[in-house]
Amino acid sequence: IIETPIFYENCTAKEILGIHAQYMGKNITELDIIRALRMVGLKNTTKKVKDFSLGMRQRLGLARAFLTKPKLLILDEPINGLDPIGIQEIRNLLLSLSKEHGITILISSHILSEISQIADKIGFIKNGEIVEQVSMKEIRRENIDLEEYFMSHFLN
């Protein structure tokens, strides 16, 4: 999912997911669409997407991705532009997708304090290459947070 998901602005959330299901060539029912919308906590699904907040758009993007029951979700800056409540809601949703639905989630983000609350494993990329992978357990054993770890290992 890209940082700012793109949708047909004059469609409702249900219509967006229906179009996506047809495009993907999947046998997805109206019930599947309703489940996906419920799972991401998207309410007021009769509203046009043009009237959605950024948080609602992020949720719709996640519902669209989840509709095909992926094993892997790749997210680019999923909390950018969200208020603290929206950030917490997306964080809880991502944790739920991972734990309850067994989905692996790969997140690209510059907000290390937030990532440290979601991730099990961190990969650091420099010049397009993964230069280090470390678990959050290992970082916590050093009694530092993810930002301190990054600063001490990559800003010499």
List each model region and its residues.
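Conserved ABC ATPase "signature" region
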Residues: 18, 22, 28-44
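Conserved ABC ATPase signature
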Residues: 48-55
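Hydrophobic anchor residue at the start of the ABC signature
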Residues: 62
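Conserved catalytic motifs of ABC-family nucleotide-binding domains
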Residues: 69
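Catalytic Walker B motif of ABC-type/P-loop ATPase nucleotide-binding domains
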Residues: 73-77
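Helical segment within the ABC ATPase nucleotide-binding domain
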Residues: 88-100
